[in-house]
Amino acid sequence: MAKKKSKKTPDNVLAQNRKARHDYTVLETVEAGIALTGTEIKSVRERRVNLQDGFAQIRNNEAWLMNVHISEYVQGNRFNHDPLRNRKLLLHKKEIRRLGQATMDKGVTLVPLRMYLKHGFAKVLIGVAQGKREFDKRETIKRREQDRQIARVMKHY
C-alpha cells in the first residue's frame, strides 16, 4: 500500500509572521503566489526571509507585497536583488477585487502571515486583518492563560 502524503509538513514553512497574529485580528486568509527573481528564490529556500514589517497593497488592479526583507543570496555576486523591493503577488482578478473591497474599511489591512513552498513554488498566506487595540491584546493573553490553567487542571483528573 502506498504511503499517504501529509497535507501540511512543517518543513515547507519558510517564514512565519507571529507578530501579525498578536497585533491584528485576522478576518480571512488568501493564498497567493509571489513573483521572485532567481537570487530571491534561492535566498527564500535558505529561509532568509523576514515578514515582520511586511504588508500588501492593491494598486492599479495588481497586488503588491511591500517591505518584506529577503536577504541577498551569498553567491549572487553582481546579479543580486534589492532586499526590500516590492514584489508582485499572483492572484486571480476576482480575489484582487475582493481584497481591494475588504481594505476599503477603516483599520483593515493586508498582512503576510506565512511564506512556504508548495510543489516547488513560493507561496504567501495573506491575511485580511484588523488592528487590535491594547486592551484587546491584554484580553487575548488573559484568555490564553485561563485556557492553559483549565487544560492543566483537566489533565490531572
UniProtKB/Swiss-Prot annotation:
Cellular location(s): Cytoplasm
Domain of life (superkingdom): Bacteria
One of the GO biological process terms: trans-translation
Gene Ontology CC entries for this record: cytosol
Stored InterPro entries: SmpB (IPR023620), SsrA-bd_prot (IPR000037), SsrA-bd_prot_CS (IPR020081)
CDD domains reported for this sequence: SmpB (cd09294)
Keyword terms of this UniProt record: Cytoplasm, RNA-binding
Signal peptide start and end residues: none
Molecular-function GO term, any one: RNA binding
Record-annotated disulphide pairs: none
Task of the protein: Required for rescue of stalled ribosomes mediated by trans-translation. Binds to transfer-messenger RNA (tmRNA), required for stable association of tmRNA with ribosomes. tmRNA and SmpB together mimic tRNA shape, replacing the anticodon stem-loop with SmpB. tmRNA is encoded by the ssrA gene; the 2 termini fold to resemble tRNA(Ala) and it encodes a 'tag peptide', a short internal open reading frame. During trans-translation Ala-aminoacylated tmRNA acts like a tRNA, entering the A-site of stalled ribosomes, displacing the stalled mRNA.
Recorded family membership: Belongs to the SmpB family.
Protein name, UniProt field: SsrA-binding protein
